[in-house]
Swiss-Prot record:
Enzyme class at the top of the EC tree: transferase
Known EC number: 2.7.11.23
Native source organism of the sequence: Schizosaccharomyces pombe (strain 972 / ATCC 24843)
Active site per UniProt: D399 (proton acceptor)
Molecular function GO terms recorded: ATP binding; cyclin binding; cyclin-dependent protein serine/threonine kinase activity; RNA polymerase II CTD heptapeptide repeat kinase activity; RNA polymerase II CTD heptapeptide repeat S2 kinase activity
Subunit details: CTDK-I consists of three subunits, ctk1/lsk1, ctk2/lsc1 and ctk3 (also called alpha, beta and gamma). Interacts with ctk2/lsc1. This interaction is dependent on kinase activity.
Function: Catalytic subunit of the CTDK-I complex, which hyperphosphorylates the C-terminal heptapeptide repeat domain (CTD) of the largest RNA polymerase II subunit. Involved in RNA polymerase II transcriptional elongation and pre-mRNA 3'-end processing. Together with ctk2/lsc1, required for the regulation of cytokinesis by phosphorylating 'Ser-2' residues found in the heptad repeats of the CTD. Required for nuclear localization of ctk2/lsc1. Positively regulates the septation initiation network (SIN) and promotes successful completion of cytokinesis in response to perturbation of the actomyosin ring.
Main subcellular location of this protein, as a coarse class: nucleus
Gene symbol of the encoding locus: lsk1
Protein name: CTD kinase subunit alpha
Compositionally biased spans, kind Low complexity: 139-152, 198-215
């Protein structure tokens, strides 16, 4: 038994959308009178042609199922809702398809890209766009007056309600500006204008990927506004424009100015209309360089310029100067000279210090000046206060001598020249050099080759300075290391294993061991010159055994500073001295005589 193709389609439910291909006459011949359930009346098909409705009572009362069969034609496979609202046909296969439903555009709005991609265009290929929306407008107008049958589902009611939504305002196009000919639409006047920003260089990918943001409206989504931008092809690869793109009509067409070129010289350079410092006179000289008295041309303050020569340094910047700068930057004390700044020239480096009028050696070379016991006590106290601070910070000066102790006219004392200073590791395995400290102020352990020493070496040098204040001249004056040891042994006695057990372990002890033992004659020599407290203090400071020497803090607690009279008194007599007295200047004056 053979069936026609139309019959097979009807049985399988896959007949093409033939409703839109047949004319009205063919429909009436196949289905007869179109009956609509409108309160028990029938509506003839001619009523649509004459635009007038003829309502008559139903001629026969039959079974409801028979009436429904007569109401809808047998050769029409789509549902009553599809026929009533004249919407495109959806097959059973498409109904079972999962995912979002294809969007059906409402009257007055052109179809969106999703409409063309969903296949709805194929199902309505027999209709032009004008006819399609004409039928949609008729169906929507009829839906507003016709009752909704109980069989209507929620999706149908939502589609009807969506037809009454307000259409979005049309976009306002602008003239092409600085965006490579792109049409930029501005937002409606109701919304605040966006902040203009610097336009960026667009690429070919930016031109191809355009979105709804460029036209001033939100991005297309199913169930929301769908509109068409003339002369622009919308695609699913829409991307928002760059955040720096301006969306207002006030966008400037000018290209931003290029960045300025980097300067040819250093970025941070300080220049002055005149030299920052003017040299007045030379006040010192040594192996490192020269020291000048200078004036600050801006503030008028006196400073000391320590010039470091670099032309003779084959290995670069002197390590002693590096240590001095590093240590002075960490020290802040009233009895330590202050480093103001560092100035660099082509072949030299200047270290700028605060200016002090004298140094201790230059003052003691002046035969007309004599310190009182109160002045000596005040100066000695300042020496140990500075040492207590240095040792507390873990710094060994290692070059305490008269020329490195500065004085001003008010009697203030400050330590200077930290070129040989270093941080103390406080370790028994420390290995320092013993070629430090000027020979006259060098302790006996260094003269015997000790390399693991501590703060006791500075205490010995300070004891020599105190004795120099009492006597007015250096206390131990030797020609070399051997003669220096002999001078020390003559005054303080020779060391032995009982008084200094560690002396036998020193490298040069056996080599420089004295032939005969000598006893100390320090007390007998100074018992008529110094007070008992001063003798006791100096004898402890100049002990041969470094472990028997007191610390700087213990020295300040000695009765010489705490209870013995006279009390410490500032050396104001320095104000009566004419000019500045430094060691280099004092020796220069003597040579002229």
């Amino acid at each position: 038994m053979s069936y026609s193709k139309s019959t097979i389609y009807r049985r399988q439910g896959t007949e093409p959308n033939s409703h839109f291909r047949r004319t009205v006459e063919e429909k009436s011949q196949l289905s007869g009178t179109n009956e609509e359930s409108l309160g028990g009346h029938t509506l003839s098909s001619n009523a649509f042609k004459n635009n007038s409705s003829s309502i008559s009572p139903s001629s026969s009362a039959k079974d409801p199922r028979e009436q429904r069969k007569r109401t809808f034609p047998l050769n029409d496979t789509h549902s009553s809702r599809a026929r009533q609202h004249e919407r495109p046909f959806r097959s059973r296969k498409s109904r079972r398809r999962k995912g979002k439903k294809a969007f059906s555009p409402r009257p007055g709005s052109p179809p969106s890209p999703s409409f063309y991609r969903s296949g709805s265009q194929k199902r309505a290929r027999n209709l032009t766009t004008k006819d399609y929306f004409a039928k949609r407008s008729e169906s929507s107008s009829s839906a507003s007056v016709s009752p909704i049958s109980p069989s209507a589902n929620r999706n149908d009611s939502k589609r009807q309600a969506s037809s009454f939504r307000r259409s979005p305002p049309s976009s306002v196009h602008m003239k092409p500006s600085a965006f490579n000919g792109r049409k930029v639409s501005r937002r409606p006047s109701s919304s605040p204008p966006p902040i203009p920003s610097i336009p960026h260089e667009t690429t070919s990918s930016d031109t191809q990927k355009k979105s709804s943001v460029s036209s001033g409206f939100p991005e297309n989504k199913h169930g929301k506004f769908h509109f068409h931008i003339p002369n622009e092809r919308r695609s699913r690869f829409d991307q928002p424009p760059s955040k720096r793109m301006a969306l207002t009509s006030t966008a400037r067409e000018s290209v931003p100015a290029p960045l300025p070129s980097p300067p040819s010289g250093p970025i941070y350079t300080y220049t002055y209309p005149k030299p920052a410092y003017e040299k007045i006179d030379q006040i010192g000289e040594g192996t490192y360089g020269k020291v000048y008295k200078a004036i600050n041309t801006v503030t008028g303050d006196l400073v000391a310029l320590k010039r470091i020569r670099l032309e003779q340094e084959k290995d670069g910047f002197p390590i002693t100067t590096v240590r001095e700068v590093k240590i002075l930057q960490r020290l802040r004390h009233k009895n330590i000279v202050r480093l103001l700044e560092i100035m660099v020239e082509k072949s030299s480096v200047y270290m700028v210090f605060e200016y002090m009028d004298h140094d201790l050696t230059g003052v003691l070379l002046n035969s007309q000046l004599h310190f009182t016991p109160g002045n000596i006590k005040h100066l000695s106290k300042q020496i140990f206060e500075a040492l207590a601070y240095l040792h507390h910070r873990g710094v060994l000066h290692r070059d305490i001598k008269g020329s490195n102790i500065l004085l001003n006219n008010n009697g203030d004392l400050k330590f200077a020249d930290f070129g040989l200073a270093r941080f103390n590791t406080s370790s028994k395995s420390a290995n320092y050099t013993n070629r430090v400290i000027t020979l006259w102020f060098r302790p006996p352990e260094l003269l015997l080759g000790e390399t693991a020493y501590d703060t006791a070496v500075d205490i010995w040098s300070a004891g020599c300075i105190v004795m120099e204040l009492f006597t007015g001249k250096p206390f131990f004056q030797g020609r070399d290391e051997i003669s220096q040891l002999e001078v020390i042994y003559d005054m303080m006695g020779t060391p032995d294993v009982h008084s200094w057990p560690e002396v036998k372990n020193l490298p040069w002890y056996e080599l420089l061991k004295p032939v005969e033992e000598k006893k100390s004659r320090f007390v007998e020599t100074f018992k008529e010159i110094l007070s008992p407290a001063a003798i006791d203090l100096c004898q402890k400071l100049l002990a041969l055994n470094p472990f028997c020497r007191p610390s700087a803090h213990e020295t300040l607690m000695h009765e010489y500073f705490t209870s013995e009279s006279p009390p410490p008194e500032p050396a104001v007599i320095l104000k009566n001295m004419q000019g500045s007295w430094h060691e280099w200047e004092s020796k220069k004056r003597k040579s002229k005589r």
